[in-house]
Amino acid sequence: MSSDAEMAVFGEAAPYLRKSEKERIEAQNKPFDAKSSVFVVDAKESYVKATVQSREGGKVTAKTEGGATVTVKEDQVFSMNPPKYDKIEDMAMMTHLHEPAVLYNLKERYAAWMIYTYSGLFCVTVNPYKWLPVYNPEVVAAYRGKKRQEAPPHIFSISDNAYQFMLTDRENQSILITGESGAGKTVNTKRVIQYFATIAVTGDKKKEEAPSGKMQGTLEDQIISANPLLEAFGNAKTVRNDNSSRFGKFIRIHFGATGKLASADIETYLLEKSRVTFQLKAERSYHIFYQVMSNKKPELIEMLLITTNPYDFAYVSQGEITVPSIDDQEELMATDTAVDILGFTADEKVAIYKLTGAVMHYGNMKFKQKQREEQAEPDGTEVADKAAYLTSLNSADLLKALCYPRVKVGNEYVTKGQTVQQVYNSVGALAKAMYEKMFLWMVTRINQQLDTKQPRQYFIGVLDIAGFEIFDFNTLEQLCINFTNEKLQQFFNHHMFVLEQEEYKKEGIEWEFIDFGMDLAACIELIEKPMGIFSILEEECMFPKATDTSFKNKLYEQHLGKSNNFQKPKPAKGKAEAHFSLVHYAGTVDYNIIGWLDKNKDPLNETVVGLYQKSGLKTLAFLFSGGQAAEAEGGGGKKGGKKKGSSFQTVSALFRENLNKLMTNLKSTHPHFVRCLIPNETKTPGAMEHELVLHQLRCNGVLEGIRICRKGFPSRILYADFKQRYKVLNASAIPEGQFIDSKKASEKLLGSIDIDHTQYKFGHTKVFFKAGLLGTLEEMRDEKLAQLITRTQAVCRGYLMRVEFRKMMERRESIFCIQYNVRAFMNVKHWPWMKLYFKIKPLLKSAETEKEMATMKEDFEKAKEDLAKSEAKRKELEEKMVALMQEKNDLQLQVQAEADGLADAEERCDQLIKTKIQLEAKIKELTERAEDEEEINAELTAKKRKLEDECSELKKDIDDLELTLAKVEKEKHATENKVKNLTEEMAGLDENIVKLTKEKKALQEAHQQTLDDLQAEEDKVNTLTKAKTKLEQQVDDLEGSLEQEKKLRMDLERAKRKLEGDLKLAQESTMDIENDKQQLDEKLKKKEFEMSNLQSKIEDEQALGMQLQKKIKELQARIEELEEEIEAERASRAKAEKQRSDLSRELEEISERLEEAGGATSAQIEMNKKREAEFQKMRRDLEEATLQHEATAAALRKKHADSVAELGEQIDNLQRVKQKLEKEKSELKMEIDDLASNMETVSKAKGNLEKMCRTLEDQLSEVKTKEEEQQRLINELSAQKARLHTESGEFSRQLDEKDAMVSQLSRGKQAFTQQIEELKRQLEEESKAKNALAHALQSARHDCDLLREQYEEEQEAKAELQRAMSKANSEVAQWRTKYETDAIQRTEELEEAKKKLAQRLQDAEEHVEAVNSKCASLEKTKQRLQNEVEDLMIDVERSNAACAALDKKQRNFDKVLAEWKQKYEETQAELEASQKESRSLSTELFKVKNAYEESLDQLETLKRENKNLQQEISDLTEQIAEGGKHIHELEKIKKQIDQEKSELQASLEEAEASLEHEEGKILRIQLELNQVKSEIDRKIAEKDEEIDQLKRNHLRVVESMQSTLDAEIRSRNDALRIKKKMEGDLNEMEIQLNHANRQAAEAIRNLRNTQGMLKDTQLHLDDALRGQDDLKEQLAMVERRANLMQAEIEELRASLEQTERSRRVAEQELLDASERVQLLHTQNTSLINTKKKLETDISQIQGEMEDIVQEARNAEEKAKKAITDAAMMAEELKKEQDTSAHLERMKKNMEQTVKDLQHRLDEAEQLALKGGKKQIQKLEARVRELENEVENEQKRNIEAVKGLRKHERRVKELTYQTEEDRKNVLRLQDLVDKLQTKVKAYKRQAEEAEEQSNVNLAKFRKIQHELEEAEERADIAESQVNKLRVKSREVHTKVISEE
């Protein structure tokens, strides 16, 4: 603890930081009883102090401070710490650590206004709610450079520690200031910034003064000034905090290498922009709005057109408008000053204020609803004018854009109407977006200003983010804020608890993992993981029809009841509605989801945004321009630039992305935590609510942090660093002169120090210390250093004084000697003998002196020579040193060049990779285009086939028409007069037909235009295909016509003069042909242009591929160069190494010589000392030379050592560079391999593109060929046109002759004019009816077809003409309009149209052939079309000679038309009859309706029965599921089986075959059911035909209606009988179901019994055979059941036929109902059969599984036995091998013995010569015995080898058997899987049956709807019949009157 004098440096802040010395002494002397002083649990205060009075039976009686006596349990009593721990600064040091101790320590310190307290590794601060003098400048200075334990707890201490760690550890730091809203985070953030700006000042001004005289400060001033500006625009009053940050910020302060301030930047997160337009009652909006209205700067009031009353503005007056603790006027001046200091220009400053005022005015804009409309309109323009003025917009444009925004629909913009509420929502969204973008832009500008471009090394990040919030109304913003705090708390927990303990385990420290219960992963995953809240929110935003309700329902479906953190809130009175609750670490929060989808999508009025982009206010235009997004994100904004257009990024997605970036930044730094606490909810200074603080302590992990700090080892240091730093504590513990490991040295060092050895642990790389021990070691080190320095100073001073004393003594002795000698000399100098001595002495020694002088001169010359040599060698060494330095520099330059080359290579690699990515994208695009083209080609092929089918049908129709025309030709002569009278009438009818045709053509063109919008290329192809089809149709028509024209040629010669008027028509047709030719030319040019573009693209791709290949070659060459350079580097390095060794050797030699020279010089000095006084001068010279020589030698040695060390370092550096280069080389090789593989891919893609190119070129050549052929045909047509022009002259003369006939026909024309007009009116009415009721027109045509069939030939002719007219309308429209007076003109027009269509046919074939070139399968069709074109050209030539025959054909047409009119009149009469029929039908329909209602009742009954059946099906499905569970249990048992006998394979295969047979039967049954369904469908179609027959025979139906009713009654009775039968069937099915349930229960019991028996029973192969017999029996049973099913199907068929007979008589609706009943019955029967099959299969599978399990058990036992046998065999084998080895050794010994005996035998033979025959015989007998023994041993050895081989074979057989058993088990596994798959298939069949019943219900509804439509059609037909009857009567009357 520091003394009061030491605390004086803190000034007036000292009492608020640390207890005084007096208080500490009083606390130590205070009486304290450790046993009785306790904390006890209290209901109100959580914990109170108390004194224990007694303890009995687990109960404690205590007296509290308030005097109350309480009795509590033992576990509710907590010991109190001694008084010396009162107000302790680090709570981790307390003896008793628990919640009440921490709480009361914080409370007592807070009562003494000591708001900062350490809690282990982090700092806790409590909000004082008043100003304290603890942030003064003297406090900043006092904390600078202080260690944590040297100064009181403070935010400045945390900041300084982070700063010092940054400098010493060279690591980025971060300070995380966290806590709930209102805890004081913002104030502490400002103090941290103030501290860094003070202690790390740069010392120079960024800008002394701007050119305009604008005020700007230093970097530290600007960093400090950023806070007032951001607070003005980003802070607001909330319920819990008067200055709450409504955005998060991460401030990075960058420092240089020396620790000086370099720059800073700010990243912001999640600005709460909804506060701009809405505030709660107890809150207010952002401070800036109230500052500008404070009237501190009146010029702002005038400039912004506002008042000083906040209630005049709706957006800022919804809550409170004043805050007692904030002076808005002073804050305005601070904000204004901060804007100036931060370097905003004058225009930018004005723009900021203007946009703020515009937001306020936006809230006052009024809108109202137009009368009788929902459209909104402005309610006054005054406010809009102000807002538009401030934003430099046009007021009218702004209002128009708000009320009538333009939205993009497809490729066009349309104006959209807005309701009043929509306009208000749009205005609010624009205001919020404007404010948010302005805020993010300000952050970007601040970052630009704080970026000084100075070099920066490290940074310290300060995080201040919105605290945890629990309001009455919590929305999306609160969820994001709370989620951020959840992530930060998880980061804190992970850093403090998990990582700390994992570090212990990794370092090998004995540590029991402590679960501190702070894992927040569940809540975090609930919010951010897939299918979490954010994921579901973003998914809902993608759906256009999603609502808040659908979002809520999805949340409930996904998480309610599945996650403990997700709850459904309970409705509370007086609170806002809540939709879901989340359990956060700080509490449970209720969230309201209204408007979340719109908030997340963040929609804006794009029309207004467009106005903003064109605004005269540059800042506003920039905010909404496209470039703002990037800058905003660069400025660190949360939502600074949403991605529009290319991607849809929601607010939540952007928020999560920025949050993940923040967490990544934090994880890369060393964090320091500051936990801010709220003492009370009332903002009362000095008061502390226990429960509130305890809740925060628990949630923030404060207690857990203290616990782990005390239990763990928070301080750690590397062994080497510890050894180096703390060796001074006991240097003797580490032996000198020998190597010792740093870890061992640290262990010895700590073991020799007097500390608690339980307070530290040794890890693998570090030594770990408990809290406080490292500080103790630091103190001991400081004391030891002080002792060592003091002792060293004393030793040095003593040595210096002793040296001085010796010098004094030597001087004293010398003085005494001199005095003595002088006195003696003075006494004897006058003696005579002395005088004689003085004269003779020099003469005696002169000769000797001369000799000595000569010797000394020689020595001196030698010394000079040695010195010269030394100087020469030194110079030589210096030159070598210079050369080495030069080589070193060269090497460094080479290394630098290689590094540059590598950097270039990396850049090129990056470029190649980018190019590769681009190529891959292009390849992908081309592939997609090719696929699209193939799809289009396939569609065209299908359409072409369809058109060919239509062509064949049209040909048949034309053949019928030709037959009709031939018949009409016979009657032509009898009806010529009628033709003349009806010619004019026909012309009028033709005009009406033309009108109808035009209308149809207009509809077709509109439809065609829509198709063009969808796909232009496909439309072109479709258009040409349609033209081709129509041309083919016309060609077929004309082919038939030409055959008739040949016969009529002679008759038409008499009517040639009538054709003269056709000349003009021919000319017009020629012009049409020319126009068509031009259009085709343009299309051809367009296609050529597209082909050229495609060709250019292909060439570009080829060029790009060549460039890539070239770049790859360059890279390969560069890599080879690099390899050569590396080899050269190695050679140069080897050379340098060699030179270094040479230099080392030379330097060693020089050193030896210098030492020798030094020795000689020292000897010379000793000799010189003995010289006489007269040689002193010579001696001094020699001494100086010697000293100089020694100095030179020492300098050379030092220089040599330095050079050697430097060269060693250089070599090491070069070695590292070499390793790095080799590593980079390997990386480059890998990259080159990757590039090579990529190039192969690109080359393949290029080859594919080249193939496509060649294909396209072939197609182009074919198209050009076709074009040339078409040009030739056009030339031929032009020649034909010229011939026709010549003939037209003759026709003109004939036309004059026909004029007379025209005058005669005109009178008849006037007679029929009125009739034509009436027909026109009738046709117009019919066309309107056709457009309004398309289905009615179709019905009328169908009725006409029926009438045509009744009247046979007459009606058939009419229908043929109508069909020909409807199919040819689109192409014949032009020549029909030119028909005016006579039939000759029509014939000529047909001729011209034929030519025109021929040319169009050629064009169409051109395109068809282009398509066919892409599709080889259509080649035959192409050839056929070419042949048709050639035939058509021949026909055209023939038609030139057959023009005369056209007259006869025209008369045939006239006759046909006359007959059509006659048939028309007959049709009118028929329609009158049909009217009667319709009346009778209406009567019949009424009766049928009654029957239908009755059938509906029956249907309801059937529905109920169906529902019961569905319930039974669900029960069956559940039983199947239970069976599946049992199967799953069997599977688990089966997985334990490892072996199986191979004999089971045959039985299993037979079982599988039987199952497949069963499946085949099931498939056959399903096929039969499908056939039954198809039969029903066919019968339905027959019923439709029968209904048509009823309409045709309506008269007979009227007569037999009574019988029909009787039949209907009978059918009803039949239906009732069927119903009863079905009820009986249902009862039977219920009985069967119960029986099946019993069987299932029995099967389950059997299964359980079987499982019990499996443990005791072991069956063999006989069981498998019995299982096979059982399978056969089951198969027979299944077959019998299949037969039964077949019988039931037959019964069903019989019932179906009976039902069909009844339906033939009944009406369609009753028929459908009966059909549905039958189908339901069939399906239910099939479901019951399916159920039976499933039960059979389940029982069968269970039986099979029993057999399988039994056999598997047997196999397992046998396998175990085989394994045991194998083990025994292996042991025997090992024994045999040992025996064999032993025998082998014996054999070798025997052989050695034989050799020895042989040797002895030789010796014996020698002895035999001496010893006799007996000895020889004995030896020979012994030899024979030994040989026999050897042979026996060899035999045994051979037998042993045989036995060994036999055992090895046996082991192999067992191994093979084991392998076979394993394979059998695998086969069993596969079989079981197949059986399980079949069970699943049966389940699916049951589900499909249920779906089929639903489909039948849908069919019934559809048929009911068709009945209603049929009734409508009948009504329409009746009305049309009435109209036609009236019209026919009128026409008939007129015709009779005129005749």
Curated annotation (Swiss-Prot):
One of its GO terms (biological process) is response to muscle activity. The modification N6,N6,N6-trimethyllysine is found at residue 130. It is found in: Cytoplasm, Myofibril. Residues 843-1939 form a coiled coil. SMART domains: MYSc (SM00242). The gene is Myh4. The modification Phosphotyrosine is found at residues 389, 424, 1464, 1492. Residues 33-82 form the Myosin N-terminal SH3-like domain. ATP binds at residues 179-186. The modification Pros-methylhistidine is found at residue 757. Keywords: Actin-binding, ATP-binding, Calmodulin-binding, Coiled coil, Cytoplasm, Methylation, Motor protein, Muscle protein, Myosin, Nucleotide-binding, Phosphoprotein, Thick filament. The modification Phosphoserine is found at residues 36, 79, 392, 625, 1092, 1096, 1162, 1237, 1243, 1261, 1278, 1288, 1292, 1303, 1306, 1413, 1474, 1495, 1514, 1542, 1547, 1554, 1574, 1600, 1603, 1714, 1726, 1739. The lineage of its organism: Eukaryota, Metazoa, Chordata, Craniata, Vertebrata. InterPro entries: Kinesin_motor_dom_sf (IPR036961), Myosin_head_motor_dom-like (IPR001609), Myosin_N (IPR004009), Myosin_S1_N (IPR008989), Myosin_tail (IPR002928), P-loop_NTPase (IPR027417), XRCC4-like_C (IPR014751). It comes from Rattus norvegicus. Muscle contraction. Residues 86-782 form the Myosin motor domain. Its main location: cytoplasm. This is Myosin-4. PANTHER family: MYOSIN HEAVY CHAIN, NON-MUSCLE, MYOSIN-4.
